[in-house]
Amino acid sequence: MKDTAKSTPSEVNEAPRRHTDINPRGWWRQLPRRLHPYILLARFDRPIGWWLLLLPGWWIIPATATGTGRMVELMMLFLIGAVTTRAAGCVINDLWDRRLDQSVERTAGRPLAAGTIGITAAVIFLGVLGLFGLMILVRLPLAAILTGIAALPLVILYPLAKRVTWWPQAVLGLTFSWGVPLGWAAASLQSTPEWPPAALLAIYAGSVAWVFGYDTIYAVQDMADDRTAGVKSSALGLGRHLKTGVSAAYLLAVLGLGSGFWLLLGPGPWLGGLVLMALHLGWQVRHLNIDDPAGALRLFQSNRDAGLMLTAAMVLTHLAG
């Protein structure tokens, strides 16, 4: 008879796999074993996700906050909020995808897919994360609270996109770029701030294009398994035009961010950060190889550095002003 006993978290993640983004010797192994599946479910062991969620908000806050103290306060709140929100989003994603994840090599070791945590426990954990995130959100102005709540449908529905469209990365872009309108609303002390639509929309569109590009690179890791499992992605949708598609997305990102911040700030130190970011994005495209999943993961992760280049320049622009 087939053994149906569930493996422990450590056993699941020590099982040999050709490719996974879970580090079996990560810091989380020093924690009590009963916490391991929760750490992995929330991706607390892989900070790249919350970095990428955080950065669009970190771009807009220095450009719009009144006073350095307010800028620092908001950036810290957004940091805590990004870690919490990303963790909650991962739980939602894995609840939707637990059966699909079993068919994909990179995700088969995730706690819900591997059976190391139950659905009830995951839902309770999600509730705790949601409550903590709400505690952060209510510290912001009313306009920001309403803007944050407006993002919930995107967070909940994103996992469904890969089932119905070849472009789920575009939906992720809309979701992960929500820090732009949220940061804009949070930086205003008024309940109904004035929104310069052209600048806001250009920056948001640029961020969406950036997310689309880097998550298409991320999807390169799973192309073979996704094709077998019937999961859709922009990497599969673009096919042999993948490099061209990523190049176009990154070009649109630079143009959108550049035009938006120019309308908002005019010339300033931020331009240097955008140039460095653009060079980094070009470097990614040059080294992208669809036959190298591990290399694609490294390129994807390098987008934290690309985004921090612009963040540093935005902070300098704020201080110089």
Residue ranges and their predicted role:
Residues 33-36, 255, 262-321:
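Extended hydrophobic alpha-helices typical of membrane-associated regions
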Residues 36-40, 110-195, 202, 259, ...:
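Intramembrane alpha-helical segments
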Residues 43-63, 177, 311-313:
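The first (N-terminal) embedded transmembrane alpha-helix
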Residues 42, 97, 118, 168, ...:
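Residue-level signal for inorganic ion chemistry
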Residues 52, 59, 84-85, 129-132, ...:
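Hydrophobic residues within membrane-embedded alpha-helical segments of Major Facilitator Superfamily
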Residues 54, 76-82, 98-148, 228-267, ...:
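Multi-pass membrane catalytic core of lipid/isoprenoid biosynthesis enzymes
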